[in-house]
Amino acid sequence: MFKYIYITVLTIFTYSCGMYTFTGADIHPNAKTISIAYFQNQATQVQPILSQKFTDALQDQFIQQTSLNLTRSNGDLQFEGYISDYQITPISINSNDQANQNRLSIKVFVRFNNLIENDKSFEKSFNRFADFNSNIELSNIEEDLMDEIIIELINDIFNTAVVNW
């Protein structure tokens, strides 16, 4: 008798753990695939590696944080969009009218289609930035700043699409 109770409790515990993820992702169980189109860089100022880095990071996030299978097209969840802005602007000026601090901003337009739960679909722009000292040569830190901003953008997109906290 104890054996049957033990098996029942173990089974219930095992199945109840399957409903939750540590990422907080809330994806319908019928959703099995995801397609993420290449995000073209349509910004006025183009950074050549940004499109590929951004697209790869978005794909990696969903591969690592969900059980969805990545497909080239026609996924149950679909992402497409473009990089709409890549900009470096001064944010702090000293008494000699020179910049003390600059800001690198990246803006991305995302179209998300959820074919299983259409009410969760959206079209939205996401914008993130990183500030840096103007005395530092941008070419020495640009890729690191870009990586930092991409991580923030990807987290925002992931949370908006599949996390309902």
Predicted regions and their residues:
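Sec-dependent bacterial lipoprotein signal peptides
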Residues: 1-15
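A structural "domain/chain start" motif
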Residues: 14-56, 60, 67, 72, ...
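Compositionally biased, intrinsically disordered linkers/stalks adjacent to structured regions
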Residues: 143-165
